[in-house]
Structures are given as C-alpha cells and as structure tokens.
C-alpha cells in the first residue's frame, strides 16, 4: 500500500462550516421520484447553522449558498464531496442511469449491476422507501442516526448500499443484490440477509479493488468486502485519535482514496487483488466455477493474506499464477508443496582475510552468466535441471479433516477450462506449461482417468520432467474419493473447434458445447459457427443459440443491454452474409488484431478469412461524396487501361473543334490563274463539315466528366471555323454567306450542348435555377444559350426550372430557345407525364391545342421539337389518347396553314418516335378494353401497317370533326370526312391523293410499330414488318424505309437475334439473295492463280445487258445492304457491353460478322474486295453505301462501347478521312453525315472517357435507335428529314459502369484483380471470371457478386442479388464515380518477418541447430527434415491465397513456427497443425497447402520425443 501526503494551509479554521454547507445540485427533470427525493432531502437535512438559513422558513425551500472562503481546486472538490447535496449522488445516479429491463449479471463501466431489481413494477416505490425510510426520515426502531453519506459498493458481483452517519459514527450496509423480491424482504420484512452495522467515522469505496475502506471509531482503518471485514490497514498519519477524527475519506481514481482534513490530504493506494494477467484470469475462472459462498470466503481470505509484491521480479507472472493455483488447491483440501532445491554447496575458502560473502562455485558463476545473457537477448530462460533430471519436485497431501473435498471437481473444471483457453493463445503457452502439472496432479488424485490421459497425451515430455510425490494415506484418499462427484467426460476446446470447421458438419449435426467453456471461448466458437453458416441462417436466432448453447445462452456469451441488441441486429441483418456477420461479431466482442495475432494458426487463419471476406452486401460499401475525377486521375486510369498507346489523347485531338483549320496554299492553288480567296473560302466551307460535326462526338467523350463552379460561368470551348494559312501563318476569316452563318449558328448550338453535357447528372450535381439564369445572362448568342439549356435538360437539371423564366424564353419565339426548352423540359421530366409541361407542349401542337383565335405562325422545327418532347414526357405510359392523335399526325396530309412544309418528313418521323416511346412494349395497349364506336376504327397496329404498305387515307387516319355535323348524315360520329380535308384546307404547294404517302409515313410507322411490340415476339407483326418477297413489291418501297422495317422486325423478335450469318441472311428476302449471287456475283468464291494471287472476273457486257433487262440491280443492292446494316445494328444493340467468358466470345463473333459486312461497303481501294462487293457498291449508289457504312461502323462502336477498341477506331478514322477536303465535299451532300458518324463512333468508344456504357432496358434501346437513326442531312442546319437535336437522346440511355479501385492511403487509382460472378442462366451454374480493374463492368442486372482487391489490398465483396444491393451499387457508380476504396495491407513477407526476428541474435540459427537444441531435439536425420520443409515450401507456393495476403503470410510462417516449437509443446503444435489442415479444407483452392500441412502434422507426430 502506497500513500502520498499533501499539505495545504488555510487562514481560518472553518472545517466545521464548509463541511456542512449545502450546495444544491441541478435538479434534473426525470420524474416525480427524483424531484421528490431531492426536495425532501434538502428540506429536511439543511444545517440550521449554515449560511443562508437564518430563518426557519428558508429550510423548506431549495437554496444555493456560495461559500465565502477561497480554496484550491482540490479543496473545492473535497468540499463538494462532503456536502449534503452530494450524499445523493451515487444513489440518484443509480435511479437515473439504470435502464429498464436490466439483465442479470451485467457488468458496466462502473462495475455496478442492479440485476432484475429494475424489472419490478414497484421499483420506484421500493427505492423511494429505501431512501426515505433508511436515510431521510426521523429515526425509528432499527434505524440509524441521520446519514451524511451514501454510496454503492460491490463485492464479487454482490451490491450493497452503504449509509454512513458521521454523528452516530456508524455505517449501515444493506445488501440489495439477488432480485427485487429478496431486496424487498431484506429491507421491509427482515429477511435472511440482514443489514450490517459497523462502527465507522467515514468510509469510501475503491472501485478497482472492490473493497470498502472504513475508518473506525477507534481510528483504525480496515478493508471490508461487502459486509464482511477483510483485514486492517495501518496509516500512520491517521492513527492518532485527536487527528484521525477530522479525516474524511473520498474515492479517487480506480484504486486510490483520499484522506483529507483541514491541513493535509493523504492519497492511499490499495493493492490490487492480483497483479499479473495470468493470475487474474485463473482466479476469475476459479471463482466462476466454485460455489458463490466459497468464492466469497476465498477472496476475503486471499485479500487478508495479500502482501505487496516485487513488480520488478522477472518471473512475477509465473510465480503469482502458481501461488493462486496452490492457494485454490489448498482451500479444497489438496495441499501441494513445491520442494525447494537443496542448499547451495559451500564454496571453497578464499585467500585469507575477511570475506563479506562466500565465494561462488564455477557452476554458479556459469549459471548466473547464462541467465544474464538470456535476459539480454530476450530468449526464454532455460529451466534449472536438478541432478536427478527433474525440473521441480511437487509434494501432494490431503486435508485429513476433508474440508472442501466437495468442491474439488469444480476446481478441476476451472483449471481445465483455463488450460484450454490458454492452449489457443500462443502468447500464454509458457504460462500454460506452469499450470498443467497442477491440473494433472489434481486429476490424478481424483482418479479422473480421462483427464489424466488427456494431459499425458499432450504434455508427456513436460510431465516427465516433473517429480510428483503423493503423501496420501489410503483411508484419507478413500474419504476423498467418496466425497467427490462422479467424473464427467473430458472435453477439449480443440475438438469443439474441429467439429465446427469440419466439412461434414451441418447445422443439424452440430453438437452442443460443454457448459464449462469460458465466456471468451464461447464467443470465439460463436464467431466460427456464424462464419460457417450454422447460426444466423434461420429466422429464429434465439432457437439456434439455445439449441447450441443451452437456455442460458445469453449469459454464456455475455450478452445484455446494448450488446444483446447489437447481437440481434447483426444476426438479423439481411444485407450481410455469414462472413460479414462474423466480422461484425469480432468487432462487437472487441477481439482486436493483437488478440487474433496470438491465436493458434487454424483459428487465426479463419478469423483473417472472415475479416477479408466480410461484407454487408452493398451496405459494406457506401458511396462517397461525389468528387469528380481530376485530370491526373483520368490520365492514370487511361494509362492503367491502355498501357501501350495514347488512344485517349488521339481521340481528344480528333474531336477538338477549337483549333483553326490549316490551309496549305501550295496544295490548293494548282495554277496561277486560280483566285486564292475563293479557294480558301471554298476550302473552309468544306472543312467546316468536320468542325461542325465534332461536337456530336465530343459530347460522348466528355459526358458527365466535370462539376461546374457556382461562382463562374460554364466553360464552352470555341467553335473555330477560321483558318490559318500555311506557311505564312496568316489567319483567314470564315465565309460570310447566309448558309454558312446559319450552319455556324447551329454549330454553336451543338457545341454548347456538348459542353453542357460535361456537367454531371442531377443525381450527383445540384444546379439551381438562379445559376442557369446567371450563366445565360452574359451570353449574347441565342444559339449558345439554347444548346446549353438543352444540355442541362438532358442531364435532368431543368426539372426544378422556374416556369417564369421558361415562359420568358419561349415568348421570344426564338427557335433555339424553343427547341431547347421543349425537348429539355420533357427530358428532365422523362416518363413523368407532368401536367405543366404537357400544357406547354400542347401550345405548340395544333392537334392538342384545338381551334384558337390566335393566328401564330410557328416554325416547323419548333413543332417537331414539341412533338418529340411529347414522346419523352409520356414515355412508357401507354396513353392511348395521345397515341391515337400521333397516329393521325403520321398519316394526315398537309394543310394550307402548314405551308411551306420543308420539315414535314422530320415532323412525321418524330411523331413515329414519340408514338413508339409512349406505347413501348405495350402492343395495342388498352384498345381491346375500350368500347368501340359505331364507326369501325381498325386497331392501332393495323393502321400503322396500312401507313407502311399503303392504303386509303380514310382507313387509317381519323381526324376529329371541326365543323358541326351535317344533318341526315351519319349521326354522332366523332370523326368526319374519313380523315379527308375540305377544299379550303388542302395545301397549295403539295397535293396528295386519297391514298397514304408511304414515302413519308412508312419509316415512322415501321419504327413505331417495332417499338410498340418490342420483345413481344409477335409473329404477325414481325411478318407484317418483314420485307416483301417479290421484286415488284420491293421496288414500290422507299429504300430508306427498308432499314426501319428490318430493324423493327428484329425489335419484335428480340429473342431470335443471334450473332450468326444465318440470322443476317434470314432477314434478306430469298429473291434478293438469289439475284445478288446470280446478277452481281456476290458471294462467289474468288479464284486464285498458280501463284496464289486473286483472279477477278471481268465484267461480261452481254451478261450485264441480260440482267439489266431481268432485274433492277439497284433494288437488289440497296435491299441487301439496308437489310444487312439493320440486322447488324440489332445484333449490336442486344450484345452491347456484355461480360463473362461466354458473352465475350459472343461479342467477338458479333464483331467479326459486322466487320465482314463492313468490308463490303468500304470505299474503293481501302480493302481487298471481290467483284461482287464492288458491283453491289456501284449499283447501290453513294448515299446507300454511305448510310450502310455509317450504320455498320456505329454498330461496331455500340458493341465495343467504352472499351476504346482500336479496330473500331481505325474504321472510324477511315470514314473520317476517306475523302480529302480539297475534293468536292459540297456537291456530295453526305459529308456532314459521314463526319458526324465518324466522330460519334470515336466518342462512343470513349464514352464518358471510358466510364459509361449503354443500358439494356427497353427505353434505353429505343433512345439509342432514335439518336443513331440513319437519315442523311445535307448540313448541320438541315432538319428537314431528321430533327438533329434528337442525336443527343443517347445521354438518357447510358449508365456508369467503370469500376475504379482507389487506394485510400495514397489517394490514387491502383490496379487490382476483380472477380465477377454472373447470374446463372437457363438453369446453369454461375459463371466466374477474373479481370484487372479499372474495368468496365457488364450490366449490373446480370451480375451476382463482385470481389475487388487481393494481393496487397483488402478484398471487398459486393453482392448484387437483391434490388436494394443493385441500387446501392448504382449509387457507387454515379455518386461515388465508381470508386471502391481499398486499404493496403501493411504486411511484410514471411522472409522479412524471419529476417527481422533473427536480427536479435548474433548468429542466425540454422534448422539443424534448432532441432539439436536440448529443448527442441528430435530424432530425425537432416535429409528427412530437408525433404519435409521443401515440401512445405512447394505446397505454399502452389496455393492461391493471393486474395488473402494476411492468410498468405501466416501460411508462409508455418515452417518457421514449427521449427521453433519446443518439445514440451510438440504435441500441442501437432494438434494445431491438424486443425489448420482441416480449416484449409474449407477452401477448394487450398487443397495443396492443406495436404502439405497435414503431412507436416503427421511428421511431427512421428517424432520420437
């Protein structure tokens, strides 16, 4: 016991005053009980002599009186501790802080447990009675005088209320533990446990030691354990009667108390029960197994004889643990004596003179030196071997009185339980060897053969070095054996673990574990059972635990309160698998990495595997804050994905429109007479086709790669259409013609649109209306504002747009503003059917607006944008009212109000797109459930077929009547004139007959029909869409419409799409295939000459003339190419961005098929083509060949989206550079389309800088078809046949899929393995394959799980089996930018660990030296050892634990651990290796290592010890 004395001087002797001055605490409004206690206490116990209470009336109310005296902080603390107000502190905290339904045997931070006292419904009244009757009210019979202090103490889990009365010099100790009813009896009915009254001046409770220090009335200090006296404490400063009366005791820290008077403060340190960890664990285990009353007596007895120990002693841990073991044995009647070695031999006499001590012998000097060097090198100390060869001698006797014999069995189970706990903790193996002899001799004395044989089997070498002498008379031994219980089976923690990890064990065959296993081991077994899916897989967790652990499973695991709630939450969590639950239990049970590191290898490997495999589905990975990748990060990602080239940089240069156009004058001017200015203007006009089309591709490349600054405007790169003359480097202004200015306006529109698409979507970036208005305010060009607005709308940022600003922009009737808002607002409200947006669109559509007195002339481009927005707003809604009106718009004839009708084709095509979006995959919709009118109206599908093939207009167009119905005509008809117009409504410029104009209605009708029946496999619709089977019928069709019909047929018969030549040919009419072979010689094998060169047949004029009279070769060629391009587009749409080994093979096959047909339409001289391909290109015409080539290259790009495929990139560059700009680009009329498709293909390959891919749902497929529809515009401003702003609808059909592993510590992108598990299809097994990340994932809906990491990084597992998990993964891809945060393992290789360990020695120990040592010697020759270790190395090198780096390190250390195992632990190590081998059998990939380690265990077993 230590004490520290502090002195302080006061100017006044005011101890009596400040000791009784009340200091009212803050009243916490918890309830009536607490307020009642505080109020009544302060009202009754206030001191009449204290300041502030001069009048009696003041005694009945709460008062706070400040002390007039100045004290130090220590004095104030002591003062507060002795005031009347703080007398209630401990007790009121118990009332306030104790939760309801408090479970029994629960230890909290303050080591106070109220059991089920709080469960009693009358607990408040009971506690109130305790307070008021025992503390606060007037004395009565059996009560003590007025109490000055109250505190709670506990001793061996029993709780007591201590009431100290300074005036009466007594302390009353009331037991309150057991349960509520017992407590009530003790307090009210004078039950068995009577309160104890002790003479006491003051007392304080020491929390850590669990004792109460009492200052008696005779001024002696004593220790109490609960209500029993343990031993006295001598404190010199308090032994004087005159001085001791003035001391007051206060708790301080965990094992210290304050003794304070007016002049000094003494800090007394109470010694701990035991000092070392091993002794503490052994004593706790013994007390848990022994009877409660016996444990109480033993603890009091131990504390009474406990003395200070020498903490500097090196073998303190070992000695104190042995003392505890001998003490426990002695108190159950088994007396064990450690026979001390004989006295040291006399040393020879010295060389005369006086000697202070005898001279040491040579053997003693050698022993002392060896001990010194072993301590310096941190080696374990060698045991002292006596002359007879034994390490120690133990003498065993039995108490002849037989006291404690009945508790012997409990003590044996306590020793055995502690030995088993230490056997799985390698750090405690040395202490385990000290306890084993005492457990063995106890089992031998008790004649428990099973336990005796168990210890001999495991520790035969150790027990052979210990001499045990039994000095037990037979009659006493018979009395002893008769007193003990029948022996119970010997159990082993190793066997329990082996049973759990055995492959053949199932939840049904799992055996219940012995009840003697400690709480820490039960927790470990629970983690292993949860990891093995034995617990937690059913719906009733309590039943599983009760079946395995018994009815008291909560107590055995140590669950109560918040820990029990957390345990249930973990086990009932649906987002985690077994490994995830096991990892969470490791954290809940506070099993740290250091504890795991000292477990035996088998358990350690399983725990590390659980931690590595742990995940909570998508719950284990939460999307981080959206921080878009910086330029350096994107460069690093591109470098990791494409290590050997700079393809990303090349694509960026090809899509850069801000550089001036280089004009080489030496090439342009071919003779001196040419006008250089005219040549420059013409050259700039032609090259502007490329510049104006670059934003179409740059929108793909930069898609959602930036976050705007809210303080600055959006960055829009300059659209540079000027030139720079070479070599003079003089700038050249662009042409000033009206056509060029119009193209420049539309070019700026698409340029700003592409810049706006750089901003992230509304899911990741929030942009408000004010910022959009601020950005637009400083821009003068309406085209730039319109393109920017449309880009914001496509990204979803116009959903919260202020309608006031929208109407303000629309009221200008500017076409750029109108087009942008009508499409942008609809895109931001995609599929929502918003009423407000519907009203805006209806304003621009006469068939929705109806007759109006306003005569407003609207641009047809604006009306086209409105009808396109209508499809986006009502997409996938099946609105039959709007759908029927759109059908009429496709088929009706132009009227006088719509002249001139320059954009009529685009309007009808957009109406077809909108109709397809609204009725997507719904067929005829709800038409079958509608009551028919008296007039027979065909189904919607039939009307579209009429419009596609041709029919009278009154059979498919049913316009609502405008004028009042004619009398005596067909009454009450909703339609009049059969869709025909009156003479006043017929247009002047265009006269259409009574039949449908299929040249304008065929394409929209076909594409709408295909979308309506998408993936429905309706053979009737598919046959209607199929190309006719005769040349005559084919010649009636517009060639462009063939592409729409074939593609629509593929959409309907989606399941029949296959990447084969047979599928492509099945879509071509047989007559076309026959004529292509006969008339064009297409597909005829090329003959080769003797040298192997191709021999192309010359065109025979007679044959050509013959076939020209028989068939139109142009029809054959165009039909063939359009059918092929549509079939290839369908293949690309279905198999785009698919993953998995099988899918990759399918994608590669599909690519080769598309490439095969692409080479047919390649420009002349760019590929080796046969004569049939050349003839087909000649007869099909330039436009057909351009359209088909563009679609085939687009199909290849869609198939390889986001991959940066070099082959597709070469085809796109070929299309981009097939004609030189100095040729006549203007006259061809198709260069803008070619350049646009080339740039689109380049952008698709690098979509979002490689982060995005196309989605696979029906809406996304439809939007992709609309944005890539092969209608050839003449220029960037040409919207007559196709509304070009629809080219950007693909932005709503893509999703991020790039998985980016991100090193948290280094804040950089790293390359790791990613294992992908595909969902099983058609009843097959799941497909597993491995790739390198960063990696573009397949569609998330097709994945079952993803595992990313391994090697030096943690392995993160993401499950995608439920919709919630897929949603979280999509959030990771969008909000988190695809980043998966990985932690790098700070582990070294096994060689590094061994190297660091051997640096402690002067000489690196060799294998043979370790085995030749007396502690590790085995009788194996060097060759056998070498073969065994080489086999281990070979097996470890063959394992596949790269995904578990910590496990890999532990397996690599098996050899090192085995070499350094002492002979005393050889069998224990052999058992551990066997367990490790069984644990590795759980991994299919670790068979080699398991067999190798199993062989090592057999070799260790065969060692002759």
UniProtKB/Swiss-Prot annotation:
The keyword Nucleotide-binding does not apply. GO terms for cellular component: anaphase-promoting complex. Keywords: Cell cycle, Cell division, Developmental protein, Meiosis, Mitosis, Neurotransmitter transport, Transport, Ubl conjugation pathway. InterPro entries: Apc1, ARM-like. GO terms for molecular function: molecular adaptor activity. Disruption phenotype: RNAi-mediated knockdown results in defective metaphase to anaphase transition (Mat phenotype) and embryos that arrest at the one-cell stage. The keyword Phosphoprotein does not apply. Signal peptide: none annotated. Pathway: Protein modification; protein ubiquitination. Changing residue 1196 to K: In ax76; maternal-effect lethal. One of its GO terms (biological process) is metaphase/anaphase transition of meiotic cell cycle. Belongs to the APC1 family. Probable component of the anaphase promoting complex/cyclosome (APC/C), a cell cycle-regulated E3 ubiquitin ligase that controls progression through mitosis and the G1 phase of the cell cycle. The APC/C complex acts by mediating ubiquitination and subsequent degradation of target proteins. Developmental role in early embryogenesis and the metaphase to anaphase transition in oocyte and spermatocyte meiosis and mitosis in germ cells. Required for embryonic anterior-posterior axis formation. The APC/C complex is probably composed of at least 12 subunits: apc-2, apc-10, apc-11, cdc-26, emb-1, emb-27, emb-30, mat-1, mat-2, mat-3, such-1 and gfi-3. This is Anaphase-promoting complex subunit 1. The gene is mat-2.
């Amino acid at each position: 016991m230590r004490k520290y004395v502090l002195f302080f001087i006061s100017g006044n002797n005011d101890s009596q005053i400040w000791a009784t001055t009340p200091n009212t605490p803050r009243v916490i409004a918890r309830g009536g009980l607490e307020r009642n206690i505080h109020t009544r206490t302060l009202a009754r116990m206030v001191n009449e002599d204290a300041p502030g209470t001069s009048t009696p009336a003041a005694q009945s109310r709460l008062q706070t009186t400040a002390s007039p005296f100045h004290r130090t902080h220590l004095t104030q603390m002591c003062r507060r501790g002795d005031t009347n107000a703080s007398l209630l502190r401990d007790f009121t905290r118990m009332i306030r802080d104790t939760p309801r339904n408090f479970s029994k045997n629960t230890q909290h931070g303050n080591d106070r447990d109220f059991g089920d006292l709080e469960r009693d419904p009358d607990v408040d009244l009971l506690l109130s009675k305790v307070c008021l009757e025992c503390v606060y009210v007037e004395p009565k019979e059996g009560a003590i005088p007025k109490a000055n202090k109250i505190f709670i103490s506990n001793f061996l889990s029993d709780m007591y209320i201590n009431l100290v009365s300074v005036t009466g010099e007594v302390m009353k100790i009331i037991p309150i533990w057991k349960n509520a009813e017992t407590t009530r009896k003790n307090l009210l009915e004078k039950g068995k446990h009577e309160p104890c009254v002790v003479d006491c001046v003051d007392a304080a409770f020491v929390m850590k030691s669990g004792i109460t220090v009492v200052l008696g009335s005779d001024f002696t200090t004593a220790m109490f354990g609960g209500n029993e006296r343990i031993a006295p404490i001598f404190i010199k400063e308090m032994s004087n009667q005159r001085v001791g009366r003035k001391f007051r005791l206060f708790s301080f820290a965990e094992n210290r108390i304050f003794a304070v008077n007016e002049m000094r403060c003494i800090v007394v340190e109470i010694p701990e029960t035991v000092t070392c960890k091993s002794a503490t664990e052994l004593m706790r285990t013994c007390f848990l197994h022994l009877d409660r009353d016996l444990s109480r007596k033993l603890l009091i007895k131990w504390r009474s004889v406990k003395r200070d120990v020498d903490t500097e002693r090196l073998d303190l841990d070992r000695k104190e643990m042995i003392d505890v073991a001998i003490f426990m044995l002695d108190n159950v009647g088994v007396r064990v004596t450690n026979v001390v070695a004989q006295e040291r031999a006399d040393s020879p006499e010295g060389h005369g003179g006086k000697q202070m001590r005898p001279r040491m012998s040579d053997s003693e000097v050698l022993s002392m030196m060896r001990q010194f060097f072993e301590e310096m090198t941190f080696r374990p100390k060698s045991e002292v071997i006596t002359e007879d060869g034994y390490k120690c001698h133990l003498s065993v006797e039995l108490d002849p009185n037989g006291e404690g014999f009945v508790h012997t069995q409990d003590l044996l189970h306590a020793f055995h339980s502690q030995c088993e706990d230490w056997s799985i903790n390698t750090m405690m193996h040395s202490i385990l060897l000290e306890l084993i002899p005492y457990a063995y001799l106890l089992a031998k004395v008790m004649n428990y053969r099973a336990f005796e044989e168990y210890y001999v089997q495991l520790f035969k070498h150790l027990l052979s070095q210990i001499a045990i002498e039994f000095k037990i008379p037979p009659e006493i031994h018979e009395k002893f054996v008769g007193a003990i219980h029948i022996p119970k089976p010997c159990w082993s923690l190793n066997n329990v673990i082996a049973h759990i990890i055995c492959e053949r064990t199932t939840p049904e065959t799992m055996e219940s574990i012995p009840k003697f296993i400690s709480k820490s081991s039960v927790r470990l077994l629970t983690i292993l059972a949860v990891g093995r899916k034995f617990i937690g897989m059913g719906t009733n967790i309590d039943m599983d635990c009760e079946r395995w652990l018994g009815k008291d499973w909560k107590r055995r695991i140590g669950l109560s309160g918040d820990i029990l709630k957390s345990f249930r939450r973990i086990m009932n969590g649906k987002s985690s698998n077994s490994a995830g639950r096991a990892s969470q239990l490791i954290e809940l049970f506070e099993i740290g990495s250091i504890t795991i590191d000292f477990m035996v290898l088998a358990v350690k490997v399983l725990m590390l595997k659980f931690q590595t495999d742990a995940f909570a589905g998508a719950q284990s990975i939460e999307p981080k804050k959206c921080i878009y990748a910086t330029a350096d990060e994107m460069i690093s990602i591109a470098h990791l994905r494409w290590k050997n080239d700079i393809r990303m940089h090349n694509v960026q240069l090809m899509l850069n429109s801000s550089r001036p156009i280089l004009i080489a004058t030496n090439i342009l001017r071919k003779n001196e007479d040419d006008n250089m200015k005219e040549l420059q203007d013409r050259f700039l006009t032609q090259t502007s086709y490329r510049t104006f089309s670059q934003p179409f591709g740059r929108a793909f490349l930069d898609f959602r790669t930036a976050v705007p600054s809210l303080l600055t405007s959006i960055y829009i790169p300059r659209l540079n259409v000027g030139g720079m003359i070479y070599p003079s480097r003089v700038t050249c202004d662009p042409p000033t013609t009206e056509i060029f200015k119009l193209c420049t306006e539309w070019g700026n529109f698409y340029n700003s649109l592409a810049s706006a698409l750089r901003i992230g979507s509304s899911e990741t970036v929030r942009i408000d209306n004010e910022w959009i208005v601020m950005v637009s305010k400083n821009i003068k060009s309406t085209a730039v504002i319109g393109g920017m607005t449309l880009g914001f709308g496509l990204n979803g940022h116009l959903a919260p747009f202020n309608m006031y600003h929208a109407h303000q922009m629309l009221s200008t009737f500017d076409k750029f503003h109108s087009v942008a808002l009508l499409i942008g607002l609809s895109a931001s409200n995609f599929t929502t059917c918003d009423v407000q947006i519907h009203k805006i669109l209806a304003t621009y559509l006469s068939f929705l607006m109806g007759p109006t007195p306003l005569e407003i002339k609207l641009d047809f481009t604006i009306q086209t944008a409105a009808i396109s927005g209508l499809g986006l707003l009502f997409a996938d809604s099946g609105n039959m009212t709007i759908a029927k009106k759109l059908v009429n718009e496709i088929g009706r004839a132009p009227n006088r109000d719509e002249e001139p009708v320059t954009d009529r084709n685009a309007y009808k095509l957009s109406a077809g797109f909108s109709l397809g979006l609204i009725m997507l995959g719904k067929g005829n919709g709800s038409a079958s459930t509608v009551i028919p009118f008296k007039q027979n109206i065909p189904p919607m599908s039939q009307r579209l077929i009429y419009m596609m093939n041709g029919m009278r207009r009154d059979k498919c167009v049913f316009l609502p009547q405008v004028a009042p119905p004619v009398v005596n005509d067909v009454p009450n008809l909703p339609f009049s004139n059969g869709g025909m117009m009156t003479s006043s409504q017929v247009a002047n410029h265009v006269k259409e007959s009574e039949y449908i104009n299929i040249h304008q209605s065929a394409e929209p009708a076909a594409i709408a029909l295909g979308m309506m029946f998408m993936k429905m496999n309706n053979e009737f619709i598919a046959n209607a869409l199929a190309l006719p089977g005769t040349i005559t019928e084919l010649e009636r069709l517009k060639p462009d419409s063939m592409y729409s019909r074939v593609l629509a047929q593929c959409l309907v018969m989606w399941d029949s799409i296959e990447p084969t030549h047979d599928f492509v040919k099945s879509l071509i009419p047989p007559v076309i295939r026959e004529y292509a072979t006969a008339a064009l010689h297409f597909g005829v094998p090329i003959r080769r000459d003797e040298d192997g060169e191709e021999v192309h047949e010359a065109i025979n004029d007679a044959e050509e003339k013959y076939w020209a009279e028989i068939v139109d070769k142009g029809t054959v060629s165009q039909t063939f190419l359009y059918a092929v391009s549509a079939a290839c587009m369908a293949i690309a749409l279905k198999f785009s961005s698919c993953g998995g080994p099988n899918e990759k093979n399918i994608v590669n096959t599909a690519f080769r098929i598309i490439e095969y047909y692409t080479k047919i339409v390649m420009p002349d001289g760019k590929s080796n083509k046969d004569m049939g391909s050349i003839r087909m290109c000649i007869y099909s015409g330039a436009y057909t060949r351009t359209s088909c080539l563009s679609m085939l290259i687009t199909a290849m790009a869609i198939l390889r989206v986001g991959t940066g495929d070099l082959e597709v990139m070469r085809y796109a560059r070929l299309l981009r550079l097939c004609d030189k700009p100095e040729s006549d680009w203007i006259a061809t009329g198709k260069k803008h389309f070619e350049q646009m498709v080339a740039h689109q293909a380049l952008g698709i390959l690098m979509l979002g800088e490689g982060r995005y891919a196309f989605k696979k749902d029906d809406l996304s497929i439809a939007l992709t078809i609309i944005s890539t529809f092969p209608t050839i515009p003449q220029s960037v401003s040409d919207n007559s046949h196709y509304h070009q702003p629809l080219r950007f609808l693909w932005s709503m059909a893509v999703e991020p899929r790039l998985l980016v592993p991100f090193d948290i510590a280094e804040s950089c992108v790293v390359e790791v393995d990613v294992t992908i598990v595909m969902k099983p299809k058609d009843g097959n097994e799941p497909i597993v394959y491995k790739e390198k990340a960063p990696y573009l994932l397949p569609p998330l809906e097709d994945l079952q799980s993803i595992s990313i990491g391994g090697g030096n990084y943690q392995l993160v597992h993401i499950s995608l089996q439920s919709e919630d998990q897929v949603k979280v993964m999509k959030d990771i891809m969008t909000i988190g930018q695809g980043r998966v945060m990985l932690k790098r393992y700070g582990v070294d290789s096994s060689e590094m660990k061994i190297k660091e360990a051997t640096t402690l020695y002067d000489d690196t120990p060799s294998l043979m030296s370790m085995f030749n040592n007396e502690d590790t010697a085995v009788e194996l020759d060097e060759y056998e050892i070498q073969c065994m270790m080489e086999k281990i190395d070979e097996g470890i090198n063959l394992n596949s634990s790269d995904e578990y780096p910590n496990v890999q390190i532990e397996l690599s250390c098996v050899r090192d651990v085995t070499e350094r195992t002492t002979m005393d632990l050889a069998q224990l190590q052999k058992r551990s290796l066997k367990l490790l081998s069984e644990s590795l059998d759980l991994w299919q990939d670790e068979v080699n290592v398991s067999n190798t380690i199993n062989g090592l265990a057999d070799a260790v077993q065969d060692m002759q010890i």
